Amino acid sequence: MTPADLATLIKETAVEVLTSRELDTSVLPEQVVVERPRNPEHGDYATNIALQVAKKVGQNPRDLATWLAEALAADDAIDSAEIAGPGFLNIRLAAAAQGEIVAKILAQGETFGNSDHLSHLDVNLEFVSANPTGPIHLGGTRWAAVGDSLGRVLEASGAKVTREYYFNDHGRQIDRFALSLLAAAKGEPTPEDGYGGEYIKEIAEAIVEKHPEALALEPAATQELFRAEGVEMMFEHIKSSLHEFGTDFDVYYHENSLFESGAVDKAVQVLKDNGNLYENEGAWWLRSTEFGDDKDRVVIKSDGDAAYIAGDIAYVADKFSRGHNLNIYMLGADHHGYIARLKAAAAALGYKPEGVEVLIGQMVNLLRDGKAVRMSKRAGTVVTLDDLVEAIGIDAARYSLIRSSVDSSLDIDLGLWESQSSDNPVYYVQYGHARLCSIARKAETLGVTEEGADLSLLTHDREGDLIRTLGEFPAVVKAAADLREPHRIARYAEELAGTFHRFYDSCHILPKADEDTAPIHSARLALAAATRQTLANALHLVGVSAPEKM
């Protein structure tokens, strides 16, 4: 019985108790909260349901708790239900009910933890979207890891997810990139506000090798050639780096297509027609303050050029027109102002503003021996995705970026993540999985199997701790999806690995050399198999491998 199963049982029991006393059942919460007590001696789980509803039905909380305890204790799944304090209920599961969690995991396998509670969502998840003017820096790398994990978590919760990369190929930064490449090809210094780094020289040389005539063309044609080829080569490098990192996208959306297709003009006309765009001093302004923004925004400047927000508005419209009812933008730390303006754009176009969510990620700092690592071999000024992977590997890089909430800045100590010790979180979790695989191999050699195991034998305190931790996984996945916080999965994996290691140190899973195989060995092997499956499921959700040997 998982915490969710117990919550359902408590709710059903509460309905029966209130109904039998002709009390109002509508006051019961939609979901009963079930938590593990801080002191394990108080029981397996606790709930404050009696305190929540007693006053609403005109009853003393302890009296209501007493009625609930008596009714729950009559259920075969409950070993005991005791009242604490003003009306808390401390519940201890029967051994067989605890064992049901193990059986459930083994039956569900790779789908344990999944649900369909977000099946009503068609999500457009846009992340990374780095400009094609250089390699992906650490901020973009954080989104590459977190965004991919969030997509996995949302899909595990039943949502349809489209992973999208917004390709910024429209704007002055592309012109500066092209001029930087051209200067490098000519052997000239990097232009002011240009891009430097070894990668600029490499791309420039590749363009000249591919087009020997490039520098002999008319100046405008030369610049356009370096622009088009440079952007394409840089973007191919970005896609290759992301793929190696384990992050792929369903859609690569070109910003320039919004202007070339007329989508920007169409969106502007919609806003003019519905009165949400007004003219002032030759410019056209969005009435964004009417939709929660702190100021109205210029959409078309007085010289007739579109402001940057014009593309954002057209892009919002395009996402909704493709059938997405939730559009998640994962943006950098300097994009807080985008939250209100994107929601305002959606509302002004006639869409629900809650269909737009903006997640803001904070900075990432790389450290070695307590000192900042600032320089990249190829990029020249910033540390890149490739640098991080080269330093600590893909699994450690992804895990280090995912395990912390994105709304806080992150320091990554390279020495810690390079180490093969329990201090390294990803090593600790992966070692737990590898140890479990080793146990399974040894069990096969000894002829021990979990088939037909009597799971009611799992009564040791460490067994109970492990079973209860396993039972929490579905709720952790649900919370990670609902709150858009995949770091919860990584932290759970660490907790599960730690609980398993403590169980392993206290309980012999397989018979020793002088022992015969006993029913408890099969039961513990089943518990180990369930733990292995759950760890593998958690690692999959963060996009990290689950090694069988280490």
Curated annotation (Swiss-Prot):
Domain of life per record: Bacteria
GO molecular function, one term: arginine-tRNA ligase activity
GO terms for cellular component: cytoplasm
Keyword presence, Transcription regulation: no
Compartments, record wording: Cytoplasm
Motif 'HIGH' region boundaries: 130-140
Keyword set, alphabetical order: Aminoacyl-tRNA synthetase, ATP-binding, Cytoplasm, Ligase, Nucleotide-binding, Protein biosynthesis
PROSITE patterns: AA_TRNA_LIGASE_I
This enzyme's EC code(s): 6.1.1.19
Catalyzed reactions: tRNA(Arg) + L-arginine + ATP = L-arginyl-tRNA(Arg) + AMP + diphosphate
KW Ligase (keyword) present: yes
Gene Ontology biological-process annotations: arginyl-tRNA aminoacylation
Listed PANTHER family: ARGININE--TRNA LIGASE, CYTOPLASMIC (PTHR11956:SF5), ARGINYL-TRNA SYNTHETASE (PTHR11956)
Family: Belongs to the class-I aminoacyl-tRNA synthetase family.
Assembly, per entry: Monomer.
Name recorded for this polypeptide: Arginine--tRNA ligase
The organism of origin for this protein: Corynebacterium glutamicum (strain R)
